[in-house]
Every structure is written in structure tokens, then in C-alpha cells.
Amino acid sequence: MENKAVNVANKIMYHISRENNWNIGDVLIAGERENQFWSICKDYSPRVIVDGKEMSIFQMIDQVSNFEVTQNNITFLYQKLKDVSKEMAFYIREQIFEDVRSKHYPMLPSRQKCLWVCEEDQIAYWKTMKEDCQCSLLTLELNGELFCGDDHWLTADTFSSVDYTDRAKHYWNGEMSDAPRKEFLFYGKAIIKEIISIKALR
């Protein structure tokens, strides 16, 4: 069964933005170019400081034999492995999800170009994902196309393209889990109606 995005007009929804240079009345156009999330994801190439020297992860790996076996070094290496694994899982997931969308669901908004928005009753959940940043909650008036997916299918806990392909089909079909965490992908024009600091929300 073909899944389609829903056309919306003057619909009020919300977006949590890491940028803080917005003004009421500003217009956001989604769907024409890559969004910030994907731009950062595809360009991920971490640098680390080892003995006061900045280097790439691969340069650090080449020097592992010189590391003393101390708890601090073990903790340091574990944290870097955790960080890199997480980001690589994100990248593989997003690339596979886009491949599946473009081949089988081309009528739906791309996660690489969309604007993520949520409904009012979802703000509290998505706020917990952004509490480590100086973010703003934007109240938006939307005119365009909207797709609803379940964040449940986006769990980044594997490097397997087979697993992500299966999850992507569930996601793009709009299937909801028993306890769905809804997210909305938007293409079109969004007008900023209100701006509130995330930290000001209770």
C-alpha cells in the first residue's frame, strides 16, 4: 500500500532549533536543500587530543601501542569508541533510510532535506533530546507536506544495513509501534509565530 504525505495549510506545529538567530515572521523553506542534521552527519570526522596533540581517530589508533594501560586511558579509549560507533550507526541508518525512501517511497519527504516538527503534546519528549544545548522552541505555521513516522524504528544500535533496511520499510510505511514516539517530516513553507528558549519551558 502506497504511503503518502499529507498536505497541510496554516497548521500550527513546533520545531526545536539549535540556532538562535531567528525572528518572529521569518520564513523557513524546507525540502530544497540538505538540513543541518544530515550535513553534520555526513561530514563527521572527529579529532582528539592525545598528549597535548590534536589528531584524527585513525592517527590515534596507530598510536595505541604507545598508550600506558591505565584506567584513565581505558576510559578515554572506551568513550571515543562509543562516540564514533554512535555517529557511524547514525550515518549508516540515515543513508539506508534515504536509499529505501528514494527507491520505494519517493513521494515522501527526505530525512536529509526535511524540517522536523512536532505537535504540542510531544514537546516535552523532544525537549529531553535537546536539553544539553541552548535551543529555541519555534512555533510555526506550516503550508506544505507532512509525513508522520515512529522514532521507534530509528534506534541506532547496529551497523547492519540489512536491519536498517527492514526498519526503514516499517518507518516509511507509517507503521506505529505499541508505544510510538511520533516525529513529523515537513516540506514546504514555515512561518515563525513565536520563539521561546527551551530552558524557559517547564
Predicted features by range, described:
Residues 2-11, 17-89, 110-113, 122-136, ...:
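Conserved NAD+-utilizing ADP-ribose enzyme module
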Residues 88-112:
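Short linear interaction motifs
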